[in-house]
From Swiss-Prot:
The encoding gene: ATG2
Compositionally biased residues, Polar residues: 145-159
Gene Ontology CC annotation, any one: extrinsic component of phagophore assembly site membrane
Protein name from the UniProt record: Autophagy-related protein 2
Reaction it catalyzes: a 1,2-diacyl-sn-glycero-3-phosphocholine(in) = a 1,2-diacyl-sn-glycero-3-phosphocholine(out); a 1,2-diacyl-sn-glycero-3-phospho-L-serine(in) = a 1,2-diacyl-sn-glycero-3-phospho-L-serine(out); a 1,2-diacyl-sn-glycero-3-phosphoethanolamine(in) = a 1,2-diacyl-sn-glycero-3-phosphoethanolamine(out)
Species of origin: Candida glabrata (strain ATCC 2001 / BCRC 20586 / JCM 3761 / NBRC 0622 / NRRL Y-65 / CBS 138) (Yeast)
Taxonomy of the source species: Eukaryota, Fungi, Dikarya, Ascomycota, Saccharomycotina
């Protein structure tokens, strides 16, 4: 430009040139200073940039200001641009506005930005092509003409020519570049040379650059503030562009709503969001906005600033932009000084930045407009960009990267270097890692510590051997930041997915990625210890697509000693993109397939860990868990989303296809061969505890929750004594490959556990350790607070609980076929239900057999290992609840059946008593014989106070006469007895034999009215009062049993018992043989021996050869297969006695005896627990084959007993009489209903032998033996009605505890009354039994002999008749004395005699008839050899075989048996011979008193059939004899005589038997019609044929 032109013209020319640049189209020439010359300078002040034409995708430029712009030009072509105070304000466009914009691409945004700065006409056309809009061409001054036109005539300007040519060229070919088709002219060539010269010597200096990016259109919206203090750009040889910048920072400004006056609000909004219309090249372009952007900041923003990123120095260089047509860039080099990133601030503002900036800038949008990739500008940009892409990037070097974790905690990465070359690709290295402000060290053995190589076909990442020392606090801080970063990444990916952006493509098959990490050691200092995690090597190869950790070691070090270790073997993480398929089981043990993309497999875990280390590590993990975010699962899923494949779809040819359910999982973790050993228990007995799992499968199901499959779990404890005890063990049962335990944690936090084929052990010895730990915690003042349990459900199938006692060695197994334990809702209610269960018992757990063979059921496994099944139960339900700090347990059992022998019953009782820790104390803790504080009793007594000389007789008389005062004191004392809990028991036990008022005169003594049972009534009131005010109850247990059956078997379950009994028998036989040889013993002398305190074996010399067979028959019954050389002591086939009980109710209250109390209460009593049991009804049945009686014990129905009252009530209470001492006492209260007893001598022998069995192996021996002191025993009056039938009149009871005299009498309805007793101060139960026998025995022998003799069978009827005769005479004399009329007196007394004695006469007649029948049957049996076979019933009560009576009768008729038809009428009763049964056994004899007719009519009918039957039998016998005689005619006469002799007794005696039976049935019918209650008593007493 000519410098001689006027200043105004120079400004106009400069304005014209600047207006070709869109940004400077609004330049005010009044603020332009021009200095022309060899070094020309153009200075602009307060330049308001025209930002209306600046287009940035997703953004709107609101304002642009330059405080000062200086343009320097030299003659040599140097160009120097200097700018100061550069401010831009950009607003992110809202989502709605953004959706209306054109589709985004990097080429379009770059082109829009450059074209908005430089008004190139052809590029404007290209812009229209890209955007698809026909925007108008840039504004050209109206008075502008082409300077080259001649004559000043207006001609077509150069731009128009270019546009036309371009348009025509673009229509010729789509593949040709529009730039190449533009015709060049000399002016264009000159223009390009000038620009190239300027670009070659271009220098740019910018200071105080500020870009504010508003994240919304609201006035108080948040924003990003980008500040650069200084930017210097220079050009060196070879078109190398060098940029130097410092003071770079990016901050987030959180704006609060500002208070702007209403008058300025509109102005502020206009300045904030828009600018004035564009100025023309005339004077209108000189208009001023009159508002400064800085004043805008001060008035609008009241902000809080967060520094996100800062760079103190940056050097950037590249080669390129050599001309306006060459924008190619290559050899980029970047050097950074210190790069500081504040992670907490970034995470805090992540949502604003991501939502409003990142995705609005780079998110793709679908549009129907022209595809930008096909535009010529995009093609030219791609050609320039990729013309030399191998040399595009050269080097990135960063001195330090400061990653701020908090205000004073930073991670420093030093010497970060990123290089790129054609041969090796891209190499990244980190020299060192330092941690500032953290209790953490990063130590690397080599430099650099991190290397990464990114080649064309191979990527390698290496980390040197590293040791990381980090504190627990800092590690938690890192975890929190890590979780926030991962949350941030998930957030970005979720938004990325919503916007439809495709994911990064996977590696190609020819690409290889490998990761190699050397030894990695992480040390976490804890309190006086170090937790060390050592990973020797980490490798990853993209070919194998898995990440391998060959070994992971975790060690807990205390004082340089390794006390715990954990080793993970061969950890493999499958990272392949292929979906993995595995077989899994759900909570119902149903098999299905699971698919996932991520799978982790660990081949083994081996751990030796100390319990203290476990607590420490558990505390650390708990802190990590608290620091980790809670994983939330979606509450509901879309109906269209498919979580698994339904297995209910119909498939063709399903017989050839198995359709299994399938689900999706986020990841799967599979662990094999897990072994964990825990040691260091506080308990003195436990050495260590071992856990082992054969396999563990863990998976995280999508939208469902966590699932664990556990295979072959085994937990055991080893004691210092050497014994090894199991806790949990899988049985050798079930389908191979199925898990034994399944744990499900659902999305709604519910837990479900399924258990199958598992045995859980209860060891009473463990309670000792638990109680010791609890007592230690209590001494330390540590109160354990248990958190509320979540909702859960536990399902148990074919699993068992094994109960092992404390001191003895038997084992009780309760097998549950199905049990469900649930807790629902927020309440503390836990429910348990079980349908069927079984009981198994063994006498020696250590001697069980180990079976390796797979059994079909767990029952088979238990039986083969040595257990005996002793019972089962049905319908178990329990509820557990906690209210007001009291644990309430309610249980109900529908039915329970126990089948036990004497030895197994004794074992079961002893085992149940030993399922707790024995609580015994030495005497110094139970009693306090010496007071803790010495008391001087004579300290307050005057020595001469009670001398006779000092006593006044008047005072004595006066004091003696004041009886009322002393009486009031005593009464007040007695009234206060109610306030004490147990003192009434002591007071009631005191008996006063005399009083101290003997000196009173007889006139002063008032009559005393005695009230019986006054103290008992007072005690009842006190007990009710104490029960209503029970305190310190910690648990209440209520358990009901609807029906209970206890079957008592003869024989023995344990091999040990059978062996000892067999040895005793052998020793007895050997002793008899030796005595016979020495002739020291006669044949009639009885030899005996006793085993287990109850089994008495006695024999004589004549029975020596049959001793074993006799004992076997007593136990098993008569069997043909019994061998006399061997004794059979196994449990009998059928039970010998049955105890039936209904409605058993148990109530247990447990009190807190350890709760802190004041010293004033230490001398008071304290309850420990109270047990209340009641049985509504119970019976004892007699099932001996030789006994004809039915019920051994039943309710005496003739005595009045309320139906609402239980037959048996038992109350037991244990307490401490003095709370500060450990001595315990008990009270017992028993109440029983009147009982009816039918005692057969064999039955009595069996019950005594059964319940007196005592095995010394199961004696419970305590460290400090203690006999329970019974403070009080109370029972009510019990009325008994006894029938007794002896079977052996001379041998007596082998135990010797009952006199032989009782076996001489048969008792029938003997009345015995056991009077109610109240005993105090009893030492143990042995003394209690002795006292009861003494009290009741003396009372019975002294006062009730006559009642017993009334039941003596031979004279009972005569006694009854004598009593009737006595009544007759008494009434006769009384009536005669009153009326003096002999006839009337005889008539009245006769009527009374008949009423009272008729029943006895009939009963006596029936007994005589029955006795005659029995005598005739015995006679027939002796003569014919078939004793009572016609009224015997085989022992089939317990056989499972059902007899077909029709076929039996048909066969019997063909064979002319014992049940003949008479006049084509079936017999009323069926006679079954024991010999005809397949299962032979001792026949069960049916009494002639059973099956009595109900009335006279029924009696006559049965009498007729009985007479008819026996006559028919006699006829059949005679007919059979006649047939035999005809067949034996050819034989001798002797044979015929023998045949007639055998048949004669039957033919003669059988009609007589029929006659006596008919008379008995008739009389029984008459008596039963008179006394209706007799039938019920007969049914209770005698067995029926259908029993």
């Amino acid at each position: 430009m000519a410098f001689w032109l006027p200043q105004n013209i120079q400004r106009r020319l400069i304005l014209y040139v600047l207006q070709q640049i869109t940004l400077f189209s609004n330049v005010d020439i009044t603020k332009l200073d021009v200095s022309l010359g060899s070094h020309s300078k153009f200075t602009f002040q307060d330049v308001d940039l025209n930002i209306s034409e600046m287009n940035i995708s997703g953004c709107e430029v609101n304002s642009g200001m330059l405080g000062k712009l200086m343009l320097g030009l030299t003659v040599s072509g140097d160009v120097h641009i200097s700018g100061d105070n550069i401010d831009f304000m950009i607003t992110m466009i809202n989502e709605d506005d953004f959706n209306d914009m054109n589709s985004f691409s990097l080429a379009k945004s770059f082109y829009d930005l450059t074209s908005s700065i430089m008004q190139f006409k052809p590029d404007a056309h290209l812009k229209n092509e890209i955007s698809g809009s026909g925007s108008d061409s840039p504004r050209i001054p109206d008075d502008y003409t082409n300077p080259s036109s001649a004559g000043g005539n207006p001609t077509t300007n150069t731009y128009d020519i270019i546009v036309d040519d371009t348009a025509s060229s673009t229509t010729e070919s789509d593949d040709s570049s529009p730039i190449d088709s533009i015709p060049t002219s000399r002016f264009n060539i000159m223009q390009q040379k000038v620009i190239a010269t300027a670009l070659a010597k271009l220098k740019i200096t910018l200071q105080s650059v500020r870009i504010r990016i508003n994240l919304g259109k609201r006035k108080d919206c948040n924003c990003l503030d980008v500040v650069v203090k200084r930017i210097d750009m220079s050009t060196s040889e070879g078109h190398v562009r060098n940029f130097d910048a410092n003071g770079i920072s990016i901050a987030y400004i959180n704006n609060e709503p500002s208070v702007v006056p209403p008058n300025n609000m509109d102005m502020a909004e206009s300045l904030y969001f828009s600018q004035a219309d564009a100025s023309s090249i005339y004077m209108s372009a000189l208009s001023d906005a009159n508002t400064d952007i800085k004043s805008l900041d001060a008035s609008v923003f009241n902000s809080e600033r967060y520094e996100l990123l800062s760079i103190n120095g940056m050097s950037f260089s590249f080669v390129g932009i050599s001309s306006i047509d060459d924008f190619a860039i290559s050899r980029i080099k970047i050097n950074l000084g210190t790069l500081q990133v504040n992670i907490p601030f970034l995470l805090k503002v992540r949502e604003d930045i991501i939502l409003t900036m990142i995705f609005k800038l780079i998110s793709p949008r679908h549009t129907d407009k022209v595809d930008v990739k096909n535009s010529p500008a995009y093609k030219r940009f791609q050609n320039e960009l990729h013309s030399n892409d191998t040399n595009l990037f050269s080097n990135l070097a960063i001195e330090e990267i400061l990653i701020g974790l908090s205000s004073n905690q930073k991670i420093i990465l030093r010497a970060v270097d990123l290089e790129s070359n054609e041969i090796n690709g891209i190499n990244l290295s980190v020299g060192d890692i330092d941690l500032v402000g953290l209790d953490m060290d990063w130590i690397s053995e080599t430099r650099p510590c991190f290397n990464a190589s990114f080649g064309k076909s191979n990527t390698i990442i290496e980390l040197a051997n590293t040791i990381i020392r980090v504190s627990e606090h800092d590690l938690i801080l890192f975890l929190k930041i890590y979780y926030e970063i991962m949350d941030f990444i998930d957030f970005v990916l979720s938004k990325w997915k919503i916007l439809g952006v495709k994911q990064v493509s996977q590696l190609r098959n020819d690409e290889k990625f490998s990761l190699n990490v050397g030894s990695l050691v992480i040390e976490i200092p804890l309190d006086n210890s170090i937790l060390e995690i050592n990973i020797p090597n980490i490798e990853h190869d993209s070919l194998n697509q898995d990440l391998k950790l060959y070994e992971v070691n975790m060690t807990h070090i205390v004082e340089s000693i390794k006390i715990s270790s954990l080793k993970l073997k061969e950890v493999s993480i499958d990272l392949s993109s292929a979906r993995k398929k595995m077989k899994c089981y759900n909570e119902h043990f149903s098999q299905y397939f699971v698919f996932t993309h991520y799978k982790v497999q660990i081949t083994g875990i081996d751990s030796q860990i100390n319990l203290k280390s476990l607590w420490i590590i558990g505390a650390v993990i708990e802190q990590f868990y608290i620091a980790s975010p809670v994983q939330e699962y979606p509450e509901a899923t879309n109906k269209n989303s498919v979580r698994f494949h339904d297995n209910n779809k119909r498939l063709l040819s399903t017989s050839l296809m198995i359709n299994k359910r399938a689900i999706l999982a986020k990841y799967i973790i599979e662990l094999d061969d897990i072994k964990v050993c825990i040691s260091g228990f506080d308990a003195d007995q436990i050495r260590h505890c071992k856990f082992s799992l054969q396999r563990l499968l863990f998976l995280n199901q999508i939208d469902k929750g966590l699932l664990f499959n556990i295979f072959q779990p085994h937990v055991e404890i080893k004691f210092f004594s050497g014994s090894l005890n199991d806790i949990i063990r899988s049985t050798n049962i079930g389908v191979s490959g199925q898990p034994h335990l399944i744990l499900c944690i659902f999305a709604d936090k519910k837990i479900k556990v399924s258990i199958k084929d598992i045995m859980i052990f209860y060891q009473a010895k463990w309670l000792d350790s638990v109680q010791r730990n609890a007592s230690l915690d209590q001494e330390k003042g540590q109160n354990v607070e248990y958190s509320e349990l979540p909702e859960f459900s536990i399902s148990i199938r074919d699993s068992a609980i094994n109960f092992l006692p404390f001191r003895i060695n038997p084992s009780l197994v309760i097998l549950f076929e199905s049990i469900i334990v649930t807790k629902s809702g927020n309440d503390a209610l836990i429910n348990m239900h079980s349908k069927v269960g079984r009981f198994y018992l063994t006498d020696n757990y250590d001697h069980l057999k180990t079976t390796q063979v797979m059994n079909k059921t767990i029952c088979d496994s238990l039986i083969k290992s040595g257990y005996s099944q002793i019972g089962k139960f049905e319908g178990l339900s329990m509820t557990l609840n906690k209210k007001h700090k009291i644990v309430n347990c309610n249980g109900c059992l529908e039915k329970v059946i126990l089948s036990v022998c004497s030895d197994s019953f004794h074992t079961l009782v002893q085992l149940c008593m030993d399922l707790k820790v024995p609580v015994t104390f030495p005497d110094d803790k139970k009693y306090q014989p010496v007071p803790s504080v010495a008391v001087d009793l004579f300290e307050t007594i005057e020595e001469n106070e009670f001398n006779l000389s000092n006593l006044d007789n008047k005072d004595i008389d006066k004091s003696i006469g004041s009886d009322s005062d002393s009486l009031h004191i005593v009464n007040s004392f007695l009234d206060e007895v109610e306030d004490f809990q147990f003192h009434e028991d002591y007071n009631s036990g005191t008996v006063w034999s005399h009083t101290t008022s003997d000196t009173h005169s007889s006139s002063d003594i008032l009559p005393i009215s005695l009230k019986e049972e006054y103290l008992d009534s007072r005690r009842t009131e006190v007990q009710k009062h104490s029960q209503s005010n029970d305190r310190n109850i910690i648990s209440e247990i209520d358990f009901d049993i609807k029906n209970a059956d206890i079957r008592l078997y003869d024989g023995y379950d344990w091999r040990y018992t059978r062996k000892n009994v067999s040895s005793a028998i052998s020793e007895l036989e050997e002793g008899l043989l030796s005595g016979i040889q020495r002739q020291e013993q006669t044949e009639s002398e009885l030899s005996r021996t006793t085993v287990f305190d109850s089994i008495c074996i006695a024999t004589k010399q004549k029975d020596l050869g049959n001793l074993k067979q006799i004992i076997s028959e007593q136990v098993q019954g008569k069997h043909d297969h019994l061998n006399s050389d061997k004794v059979y002591l196994y449990p009998s086939k059928h039970y010998k006695s049955l105890i039936k009980a209904n409605e058993l109710i148990f109530k247990i209250k447990i009190y807190d005896s350890n709760s802190p109390r004041n010293e004033e209460f230490n001398n008071h009593a304290a309850k420990l627990f109270q047990i209340t049991a009641s049985i509504s009804t119970y019976e004892v049945l007699d099932n001996l084959p030789t006994s004809t009686w039915n019920k051994f014990v039943t309710l005496l129905k003739k005595e009045a007993w309320p139906k609402s009252e239980p037959m048996l009530y038992f109350d037991f209470m244990l307490f401490k009489p003095i709370n500060s001492l450990e001595a315990t006492e008990a009270t017992i209260n028993i109440r029983s209903a009147p009982l009816r007893i039918h005692a057969d001598q064999y039955m009595v022998d069996f019950l005594l032998r059964f319940f007196q069995f005592n095995d010394k192996r199961f004696e419970l021996i305590d460290e400090y033996p203690e006999i329970l002191f019974l403070q009080k025993f109370k029972s009510n009056t019990i009325k008994l009605r006894i029938d007794y039938k002896p079977n052996k009149t001379s041998s007596g009871m082998y135990s010797g505890k009952i006199s032989d005299l009782i076996n001489l009498f048969v008792l029938d309805e003997s009345k015995v009354t056991l009077k109610g007793v109240v005993l105090h101060g009893i030492n143990g139960f042995n003394e209690l039994s002795e006292q009861l026998v003494k009290i009741w025995g003396n009372d019975v022998t002294s006062k009730q002999i006559f009642n017993i003799l009334q039941g003596f069978a031979p004279v009972k009827s005569f006694i009854a008749l004598g009593a009737g005769a006595q009544t007759f005479i008494t009434v006769l004399l009384a009536e005669y004395k009153r009326d003096r009329s002999i006839s009337r007196s005889v008539k009245k007394s006769g009527n009374i005699f008949i009423k009272t004695t008729t029943g006895d006469f009939i009963k006596l007649g029936a007994k005589l008839a029955v006795g005659t029948q029995a005598l005739l049957e015995n006679t027939e049996g002796i003569l014919s050899g078939n004793a009572t076979q016609n009224r015997t019933l085989a022992d089939v009560s317990q056989t499972n075989k059902v007899l077909d009576l029709d076929s039996l009768l048909q066969q019997d008729q063909v064979l002319i048996g014992r049940n003949p038809k008479i006049r084509n009428k079936s017999p009323s009763a069926i006679i079954i011979d024991a010999a005809d049964l397949e299962e032979s056994g001792r026949p069960k004899v049916v009494s002639l008193y059973s099956e009595q007719p109900l009335d006279l009519h029924k009696g006559l009918e049965e009498a007729y059939h009985a007479l008819e039957k026996h006559i028919q039998i006699a006829y059949n016998t005679i007919w059979q004899t006649n047939q035999e005689l005809r067949g034996e005619e050819s034989r001798s006469a002797k044979a015929a005589a023998v045949t007639i002799a055998k048949a004669a007794p039957v033919a003669v005696i059988r009609p007589m038997i029929g006659a006596t039976e008919a008379i008995a049935k008739t009389l029984q019918g008459i008596y039963n019609q008179l006394d209706k209650s007799n039938i019920e008593e007969i049914n209770d007493k005698y067995k029926k044929e259908d029993n």
